[in-house]
Amino acid sequence: MSALLFGLALTLLFTWFSVFFGLHGAAGDVRRILCYVRVPRTLGALLSGAALGASGYLMQEALHNTLASPSVMGVNAGAGLFALLAALLFPAVTAARFVLAFLGALLSISLVLLIARRAGYSRSVIVLSGVAVSALMGAAVNGLVTFFPHAVADKQAFTLGGFAGLQYDGLFFSAVFILPGLLAGALLGGGIDLFALGDEVAQGLGLSVTRHRLLTMVTATVLAAAAVCIGGLIGFLGLIVPNVLRRFFSGRMSARQMFTLSGLYGSALLVAADFLARRLFYPYELPVGLLLSLLGAPFFIWMLMHRKRGI
């Protein structure tokens, strides 16, 4: 584990050193493209991927449901709706987008859990509740696009997901939420390990299960909302990464280690998806969210088909 983390960190360090040392002596246009286009875009994909991967892992562990993720649970759609509202109502206030996105994400997950509680708290009910809330929030987003086409003309790409045009102020505000959220998620790892023993056993060992589960869900919601603010509606990454890692490392790593790997591989997957989105049909660019949906939707169907086998 430590060797893997060291190797990833070393690779990332050498990559950024090569970028910044390569700027020395470069032409002015090249320097501007690297500094104000490529670097913010890559950093945005790294931060957003880490947040979505880690958020998906936290949700799955808190709800004991491997089908849970920010996109499936309606968190992404709720955050996206309120972030779009903030961009329309307060276009000059960057912080408003993050605050309203968090409120939208919190509203969505609250609706999902409320519906699931009323309908019978089971795995399938939680997933169906999330799909319903996602559809509701998605319809509201489409309504804004339909009724205010001129106001959202430059924001429609937000609904498809991507990092084109990302600037440093957005990165700064996202890092303010994502980095503490990642730290909080790592600190919650000990309690998540106890979740696996069952609520009664965890309670007997001194863990306040309700409070710890609430903190875990709030942390996951903050991470997902911040990721939506910089990358738009990128779905399925929080579902794919934790489940793939669980198939390889389940039972061999602690929750804190699995959380760390979910963030790292989420970053790697989103950076790779962003690269492919730019290169597959060059000079045209695919939305990153569309590319991940093409990968994630079949994976989600496969998960549903195998749920009775305990996956």
Question: For each predicted feature, which ranges?
Answer:
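Alpha-helical transmembrane segments in inner-membrane proteins
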Residues: 1-311
